[in-house]
Design a protein with these regions (language model features):
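Intrinsic disorder/low-complexity signature
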Residues: 2-4, 52-53, 61, 90, ...
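N-terminal single-pass transmembrane signal-anchor helix
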Residues: 13-44
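Membrane-proximal N-terminal amphipathic helix
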Residues: 45-74
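Low-complexity, intrinsically disordered/propeptide-like segments
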Residues: 9-11, 25-26, 35, 81, ...
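N-terminal leader/signal peptides at the extreme start of proteins
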Residues: 1-17
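Periplasmic/extracellular, small/polar-rich flexible segments of pilin-like filament-forming proteins
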Residues: 68-178
Length: 178
């Protein structure tokens, strides 16, 4: 026997991932990341729309509540920095100032979720939602996230319009003053 004196040496095979296995794992991680980014983007877009709709409702409720104060006997409403802005017993034409007061009050309280550095509300209307670039200035009506307030010619209806989408018709609420 020629091999009788040989000491048997066991060579253990090192365990490691092959390059193919590593590439498969990296590809799977990449796919999961891509799906996650798309899902997150959709989630934030939906959240911004919901916040814009909620802000519209808050503005409408605030105006309704303030006008109700006039009906129960308060003489002044629309508090801005500790000062009441509107005289309930004032002239019919003084109602034309209400949109300006509301604009001041809410530009201090809410933000445009799409462009936080610009005012969320402006006086004007009627509006149609469109895709004007933000660089046109914050006073331009009709782009997503903006709220518009106006009053009809007879000073009897306050109109709030909000662009929730970047195109189409705005969400609109009419509030009777009388």
């Amino acid at each position: 026997m020629k091999f009788a004196n040989l000491n048997l040496i066991y060579i253990t095979k090192q365990k490691a991932f092959t390059i193919i296995e590593l590439l498969v794992v990296v590809a799977i991680i990449g796919i999961l990341a891509a799906v996650g980014v798309v899902a997150y983007s959709g989630y934030t877009k939906s959240a911004k729309k919901k916040v814009t709709e909620a802000n519209h409702k808050v503005i409408a409720k605030y105006i309704q509540n303030e006008l109700a104060k006039c009906l129960i006997g308060e003489s002044k409403i629309l508090d801005y920095n500790g000062s009441k802005q509107f005289d309930c017993n004032g002239t019919h034409n003084s109602r034309g100032n209400i949109p300006g007061y509301i604009e001041k009050i809410f530009n201090d309280k809410i933000q445009d979720v799409y462009e936080p550095s610009t005012a969320a509300m402006t006086v004007g209307g009627p509006i149609k939602c469109h895709g004007i670039p933000k660089s046109y200035g914050y006073k331009k009506l009709g782009y997503q996230g903006k709220h518009s307030i106006s009053i009809n010619v007879g000073y009897t209806i306050i109109i709030i319009e909000t662009c929730v989408e970047d195109s189409g018709s705005p969400v609109k609420t009419d509030i009777s003053i009388e």
